[in-house]
A protein has these predicted regions:
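Pre-DFG segment of protein kinase catalytic domains
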Residues: 7-9
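ATP/Mg2+ or Mg2+-diphosphate-binding catalytic cores
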Residues: 93-157
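All-alpha amphipathic helical-bundle segments outside canonical DNA-binding/catalytic cores
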Residues: 68-84
Length: 157
């Protein structure tokens, strides 16, 4: 009616981090989005978020991402990378549970892309000393070892 597209996500029906839904939409392991489109949609989301927060008198989104204190430029991107790690690991676990608990094999091919995207997000975090955490490197090492082992098993078959 008003020529606006609205996306309503009731998957978990609860409030969560501001970055959860955009990460779910743009980095879903079983939906391929080219990087140019993803970047364009992400930029539009960031601008819309800032505009809506200002319009509602909520202040800057960068200040609201974490109530612990003032934020600096790029913090929203850091929170996106952190959310990608959390959301993609959740997705990989969900896909595995669909197979083990329900016998559904249709999501199995999405586990590897989810883990590879998790590795990319961890590398982005580790590439910025202000963003990196000691646990990020350990998690990246474990995931890469798993993916390497998994690839070797597949090649032997």
């Amino acid at each position: 009616q008003h020529e606006k597209l609205w996306v309503i996500d009731f998957q978990d029906a609860r409030l969560g981090p501001i970055t959860y839904d955009i990460v779910s939409l743009l980095w879903d392991p079983y939906v391929q989005i080219n990087e140019k489109l993803r970047s364009s949609l992400l930029l539009h989301w960031e601008k819309s978020l800032e505009k809506e927060a200002t319009k509602r008198g909520l202040g800057s989104v960068l200040e609201r991402v974490n109530a612990a204190g003032p934020r600096e430029s790029g913090e929203l991107r850091r929170e996106l990378e952190r959310m990608k790690v959390q959301r993609l690991l959740k997705a990989a676990g969900s896909y595995a549970s669909f197979y083990f608990l329900k016998g559904r094999k249709d999501y199995l091919p999405s586990i590897e892309p989810a883990l590879r995207s998790t590795c990319e997000a961890l590398k982005t975090l580790l590439g910025n000393p202000k963003w990196a955490r000691r646990e990020d490197e350990r998690l990246l090492t474990l995931l890469e070892a798993f993916l390497l082992r998994d690839s070797a098993i597949i090649e032997r078959r």
